Amino acid sequence: MALWGGRFTQAADQRFKQFNDSLRFDYRLAEQDIVGSVAWSKALVTVGVLSAAEQQQLEEALNVLLEEVRANPQQILASDAEDIHSWVEGKLIDKVGQLGKKLHTGRSRNDQVATDLKLWCKDTVVELLSANRQLQSALVETAQHNQDAVMPGYTHLQRAQPVTFAHWCLAYVEMLARDESRLQDALKRLDVSPLGCGALAGTAYEIDREQLAGWLGFASATRNSLDSVSDRDHVLELLSDASIGMVHLSRFAEDLIFFNSGEANFVELSDRVTSGSSLMPQKKNPDALELIRGKCGRVQGALTGMMMTLKGLPLAYNKDMQEDKEGLFDALDTWLDCLHMATLVLDGIQVKRPRCAEAAQQGYANATELADYLVAKGVPFREAHHIVGEAVVEAIAQGKPLEALPLVDLQKFSPVIADDVYPILSLQSCLDKRAAKGGVSPQQVAQAISDAKARLS
């Protein structure tokens, strides 16, 4: 059923109809459209368009339709309706007859779809926040069990300084906490109802839009009708949040792909999140992580596409805005799936402590400790930096770690070096000395785990 047509003397070309129709993707707004319609029916009672009995009949029919949709949302796709609004109205008319045709009084599809999409966004943000916190909790739990797993930290993908696997986990907790904060901020901004703004100039009926917003669970009503039907900032903001969140998950995936490689061999992924090769029997591929990394690109693309769609649009509604949904639906679905998959990857991961410690001992990751030792002995840091660089060259030439160089060799570079240098160069000392807030010392890591648990409880 089309919601327009009186103005036209020819039927739409079937090719145009297929091009124009949006039911194949906006069917996902069915529940929100029905909920919005129930609220609108109540508003129409307050302005005398519907009697209380008529409203009750409409609400009962809409609630039946809502249950039918929840039981089988795919049924909607069998229809040739133009969009979800016409499908809901058609089904309502089937149930209550001519009374169903009164529901759209004073309402436009412009404010209707804007409301539906905001309601869907609110529901989806709640799901994303839950999945985000589940992953944070999984990371904290993994950190709790791996506080003593010493491994190399990297800059430029070169071994830099020793850290722990727990500290690595907590770095991603911080990223996810920022993602959580961004989603909460976005939720505040989209929590305003555009319903009652009509096509662009507002409704001709003196509906209490604040009351209407409250019925729908919004914090308030929007302030300007022209902006309300044109606004897709919430789409852009959620796509931006998703893009940033997926960058974090992609980096998480890349780190673990490397840690899982034969070259690093720091972790073993569970069989439940890996796959094999059709040719090479020995392969165990980190497909879950590679897909997380790969899916990041499609989310970034959705943000870029939406930016380009909106950048040249005049006020108010334009059909271009129909393009807001597919990218948003796909991006947020993808983000949600990747959050769940990242959590699953952590469930069953095995950290190979001996191999991690062996790698941390290599690469002269304790060189900074030797420089700090010299500074404590009164050597200016820049000079100490140069001295240690020369000592590293000597250690490489001898094929030894710094801590294995004889004292006489170390003293060739600085006479202030004494026997007390060797405890300083141990892995544990390297960790213990990083005791400022946010550092990798066991005390700081334990405190960070405790703080994260308290925040997530």
UniProtKB/Swiss-Prot annotation:
The metabolic or biological pathway listed in the UniProt record of this protein is: Amino-acid biosynthesis; L-arginine biosynthesis; L-arginine from L-ornithine and carbamoyl phosphate: step 3/3
What is the name of this protein?
Argininosuccinate lyase
Q: Which InterPro entries match?
A: Arg_succ_lyase_C, Argininosuccinate_lyase, Fumarase/histidase_N, Fumarate_lyase_CS, Fumarate_lyase_fam, Fumarate_lyase_N, L-Aspartase-like
PROSITE patterns per UniProt: FUMARATE_LYASES
Per UniProt, which keywords does this protein have?
Amino-acid biosynthesis, Arginine biosynthesis, Cytoplasm, Lyase
Kindly state a single biological-process term from the GO annotations of this entry: L-arginine biosynthetic process
Provide the gene name from the record: argH
State the compartments where it is located: Cytoplasm
Enzymatic reactions: 2-(N(omega)-L-arginino)succinate = fumarate + L-arginine
Query: What family is this protein classified in?
Result: Belongs to the lyase 1 family. Argininosuccinate lyase subfamily.
Q: Which GO terms describe its cellular component?
A: cytosol
What Enzyme Commission number(s) appear in the record? 4.3.2.1
* The organism of origin for this protein: Klebsiella pneumoniae (strain 342)
A Pfam family reported for this protein in Swiss-Prot or TrEMBL: ASL_C2
Q: Which NCBIfam families match?
A: argH (TIGR00838), PRK12308.1 (NF008964)
Query: What GO annotations for molecular function exist for this entry?
Result: argininosuccinate lyase activity
Looking up CDD domains in the UniProt record yields:
Argininosuccinate_lyase (cd01359)
